Amino acid sequence: MAPPRAPYIVPALKKHTATVIMAHGLGDRMSLAQNWRRRGMFDEVAFIFPNAPMIPITVNFGMTMPGWHDLTKLGRELDYESAIRHQDEPGVLRSRDYFNTLIKEQIDKGIKPSRIVLGGFSQGAAISVFTGITCKEKLGGVFGLSSYLVLSDKLKNYIPENWPNKKTPFFLAHGLEDEIVLFDFGDLSAKKMKEIGLEDVTFKSYPNLGHSADPVEIEDLARFLQKVIPPEDDGQASAGL
């Protein structure tokens, strides 16, 4: 398998004090930064959009496409129990390790872990949530749009002993009409996250929303980011990443 292409980066406009790593879903790209920038938001935040490697996806008849892990089922076939039975554990762990590498790169650049937020959409959200739960660094926050919990039956095996992110804010959002990752799967995943001991999990639902994002959901996400990585710029210009 070829390594993923380098991430797409939107540098901070002011002094770089925080980073948001946003991962796409199966085969797509996710970019909200430009819209927020046009509104004068998150000027001191660098946005990193990682690219998934090209892998065969079983549910797409083995076709090679960008993916964070293999999937054997989608839609009404992808429920909590079937997800446990058909998990691509090596793929999940490979992507988690890559996300942790991106986090470490930001820390090495001087960004505090508490000013790093990890999240994404669909598959990217699932890996972001798993990475956030199991990360050895205390992150600022984690979000997942149309997300689901991977390796839930083995999750405790991967949680660090001191569990740095037990109290980290997690924001989960899901459309009630999602036809790819069903709402019930997302809802149950959020409940499972609370059951294992996460103390700050917010789960919001959106009527008439399928497997996509809408303006209300994006506004809720923006408010979450404003809360967990508030501005602390001193007015200096950014040197970029």
UniProtKB/Swiss-Prot annotation:
Keyword Magnesium among record annotations: no
Keywords recorded for this protein, A-Z: Cytoplasm, Fatty acid metabolism, Hydrolase, Lipid metabolism, Nucleus, Serine esterase
Reactions catalysed, as given in the entry: S-hexadecanoyl-L-cysteinyl-[protein] + H2O = L-cysteinyl-[protein] + hexadecanoate + H(+)
Single annotated GO MF: carboxylic ester hydrolase activity
GO terms for cellular component: cytoplasm; nucleus
Entry's Gene Ontology BP terms: fatty acid metabolic process
Signal peptide: none
The UniProt record lists the keyword Hydrolase: yes
Subcellular location: Cytoplasm; Nucleus
Pfam families tied to this protein: Abhydrolase_2
EC number: 3.1.2.-, 3.1.2.22
Active site as annotated: S122 (charge relay system), D178 (charge relay system), H211 (charge relay system)
Family: Belongs to the AB hydrolase superfamily. AB hydrolase 2 family.
Functional summary from the UniProt entry: Hydrolyzes fatty acids from S-acylated cysteine residues in proteins with a strong preference for palmitoylated G-alpha proteins over other acyl substrates. Mediates the deacylation of G-alpha proteins such as GPA1 in vivo, but has weak or no activity toward palmitoylated Ras proteins. Has weak lysophospholipase activity in vitro; however such activity may not exist in vivo.
PANTHER family listed in its UniProt record: LYSOPHOSPHOLIPASE-LIKE PROTEIN 1, LYSOPHOSPHOLIPASE-RELATED
The protein's name: Acyl-protein thioesterase 1
Organism (species): Aspergillus fumigatus (strain ATCC MYA-4609 / CBS 101355 / FGSC A1100 / Af293) (Neosartorya fumigata)
